[in-house]
Regions:
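Short acidic/glycine-rich loop or secondary-structure boundary segments that cap or lie
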Residues: 8-10, 35-36, 56-57, 106-107
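Short beta-strand segments
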Residues: 1-29
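C-terminal edge-of-domain segments
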Residues: 59-120
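Short, solvent-exposed amphipathic alpha-helical segments in soluble enzyme
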Residues: 16-17, 42-44, 114-115
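Buried hydrophobic positions in well-ordered alpha/beta secondary-structure cores of metabolic enzymes
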Residues: 7, 38-39, 98
Length: 120
């Protein structure tokens, strides 16, 4: 979920989300340009993950960075191909890097923070 600078919320499913490294996740944004513009003006993002068959779930509060080309873009696209979430790294779309700031339970209890007592 994202929010514009004016506070207008936006939410959508992302089927190409990957864990990129120990501090970040990433995905390919294929949606309308408005989704990318909203991330550029307000990079605060909440990602919900739930696996009902294992009765687990978390909220990830993240800060997004947009990559339309360059080495970070290519690294994310290559990882998506490696994980079979894309068939090829054809250079289309936008790579979104999400630095994880906080991990919470689905009930809002803080499990882990990048910076203690982070005001988010």
């Amino acid at each position: 979920a994202t929010s514009s600078i004016e506070g207008v919320p936006n939410a959508g499913f992302r089927g190409t989300m990957i864990v990129l490294d120990e501090e970040s996740m990433a995905y390919r944004e294929r949606g309308p340009l408005s989704a990318v513009l909203q991330l550029e003006e307000n990079p605060k993002v909440v990602v919900l993950y739930r696996n009902p068959s294992h009765d687990v779930g978390w909220k990830f509060r993240c800060t997004a960075a947009i990559h339309k080309d360059g080495p970070v873009f290519q690294r994310i696209m290559d990882q998506l191909v490696e994980h079979r979430l894309l068939t090829n790294s054809d250079g289309t779309g936008t790579a979104v890097l999400l630095r994880v700031d906080q991990i919470l339970t689905l009930y809002g209890e803080v499990v882990q923070e990048r910076v203690p007592n982070l005001s988010w």
